[in-house]
Amino acid sequence: MSSPPEGKLETKAGHPPAVKAGGMRIVQKHPHTGDGKEERDKDDQEWESTSPPKPTVFISGVIARGDKDFPPAAAQVAHQKPHASMDKHVSPRTQHIQQPRK
């Protein structure tokens, strides 16, 4: 098989044509050019800003103060499951499997 000349590459839709071996296409990963990366860096610097201010939360008409109103310990207690005062005793069921006689 002949390879295309190094100086001039044919492009289809802006990229070189697919390489086939045994009737199947072979994926070729090529690194991107550095031109687009420089443009992205400029855009990132322009749009860098701090996070937007947090909106004030009103609970029953009063401004909430975050952890001061609801400490983390109180939230943990609210999410814990209540424990049973007495243990449940499950009676074991015997499984009877019907099998044919010999």
UniProtKB/Swiss-Prot annotation:
Record's keyword terms, sorted: Acetylation, Apoptosis, Autophagy, Phosphoprotein, Translation regulation
Keyword Kinase set for record: no
Disulfide bonds, paired cysteine numbers: none
Region (Disordered) location: 1-102
GO BP term (any one): apoptotic signaling pathway
Biased composition (Polar residues): 92-102
Modification(s) after translation: Phosphorylated. Phosphorylation by MTOR inhibits the suppressive activity of DAP toward autophagy.
Modified residues (N-acetylserine): 2
Function, in words: Ribosome-binding protein involved in ribosome hibernation, a process during which ribosomes are stabilized in an inactive state and preserved from proteasomal degradation. Acts via its association with eiF5a (EIF5A and EIF5A2) at the polypeptide exit tunnel of the ribosome, preventing mRNA translation. Involved in ribosome hibernation in the mature oocyte by preventing mRNA translation, leading to ribosome inactivation. Ribosomes, which are produced in large quantities during oogenesis, are stored and translationally repressed in the oocyte and early embryo.
Family: Belongs to the DAP-DAPL1 family.
Protein name per the record: Death-associated protein 1
Organism annotation: Mus musculus (Mouse)
Gene name tied to this protein: Dap
